[in-house]
């Protein structure tokens, strides 16, 4: 739509040829319910386009904190990028400027360590490089896990996670602004026997896989029957089925499926994770870090 010439199959990116040329179109419209990765990609190239770019988002906007994170980091590197109203983003032609920058650790990745603490009888974990006043929308993980008995102690450029044992009897939450945390909480709540209703999950269908369908399928292997409603809600009201004797979790080429299900070994005799290498997308040291924390991991 902004002028890039694509030749080849629409279904397979490996069969496409992209022809570069000057991109002059300065306005584009796209649905606000697409993955924020598409919006962030357009924002980041916008300053170097001939006429800049105005992005109009239609309908409901999901994952707004991820968009705001992109805007904040662009501003940190000298580019003015901003909302002009609730559904419109504008970036003028301008140049990025290099600047010293401390890269914060990933709160999304931290969620799996919160999960480990929540599923443990006693645990304390220190995670370096995380800030209380974080740009990242997924830093809300600390507040949500407080409901599941995990306390967060903020230090200088680090957090300490401790089990306090005080969990809610039920958890209802709208993940519209933190969809990448949903898998972690689905698995954690079920294993803690905490019924839940999680809404705002419509973007899970357009991630690395249809995460809603994947969660329903894989949680059934562990003996939990989840229900999807309106394409945006996952719920569990305590309904159980027979647990597979040797559950093997399929990861669907999705890094978050592997990392959300691995900690289930704390509540089950064992768990098998198929295609564990998928974690390389966002957390390549995940398995090594688990080993250092005392988990026994074997390749089969």
Short names for language-model regions:
Residues 66-70, 94, 102, 115-116, ...:
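Short acidic, glycine/serine/threonine-rich loops at helix termini
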Residues 78-89, 123-130, 149-161, 195-196, ...:
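Flexible, glycine/charged-enriched surface loops at secondary-structure junctions
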Residues 134-151:
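Conserved loop->alpha-helix
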Residues 19-62, 91-133, 162-206, 237-281, ...:
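Structural motif
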Residues 1-13:
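Single conserved hydrophobic/aromatic residue that forms the stacking wall/gate
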């Amino acid at each position: 739509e902004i002028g890039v010439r694509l030749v080849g199959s629409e279904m397979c990116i490996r069969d496409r040829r992209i022809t570069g040329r000057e991109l002059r179109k300065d306005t584009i419209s796209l649905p606000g319910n697409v993955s924020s990765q598409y919006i962030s990609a357009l924002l980041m190239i916008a300053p170097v386009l001939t006429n800049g770019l105005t992005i109009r988002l239609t309908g409901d906007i999901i994952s707004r904190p991820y968009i705001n994170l992109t805007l904040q980091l662009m501003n940190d590197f000298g580019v003015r990028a901003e909302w002009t109203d609730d559904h419109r983003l504008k970036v003028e032609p301008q140049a990025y400027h290099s600047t010293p920058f401390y890269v914060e650790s990933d709160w999304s990745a931290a969620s799996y360590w919160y999960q480990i603490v929540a599923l443990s009888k006693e645990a304390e974990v220190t995670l370096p490089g995380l800030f209380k006043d974080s740009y990242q929308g997924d830093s809300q993980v600390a507040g949500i896990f407080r409901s599941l008995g995990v306390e967060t102690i903020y230090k200088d450029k680090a957090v300490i996670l401790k089990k306090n044992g005080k969990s809610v009897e039920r958890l209802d939450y709208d993940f519209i602004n933190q969809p990448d945390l949903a898998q972690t909480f689905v698995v954690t709540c079920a294993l803690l026997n905490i019924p839940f209703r999680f809404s705002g999950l419509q973007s899970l269908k357009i991630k690395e896989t249809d995460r809603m369908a994947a969660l329903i399928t894989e949680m059934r292997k562990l003996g939990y029957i989840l229900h999807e409603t309106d394409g945006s809600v996952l719920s569990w009201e305590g309904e159980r089925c027979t647990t597979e004797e040797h559950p093997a979790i399929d990861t669907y080429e999705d890094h978050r499926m592997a990392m959300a299900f691995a900690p289930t070994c704390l509540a089950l005799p064992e768990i098998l994770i198929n295609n564990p290498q998928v974690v390389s997308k966002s957390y390549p040291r995940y398995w090594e870090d688990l080993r250092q924390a005392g988990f026994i991991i074997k390749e089969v």
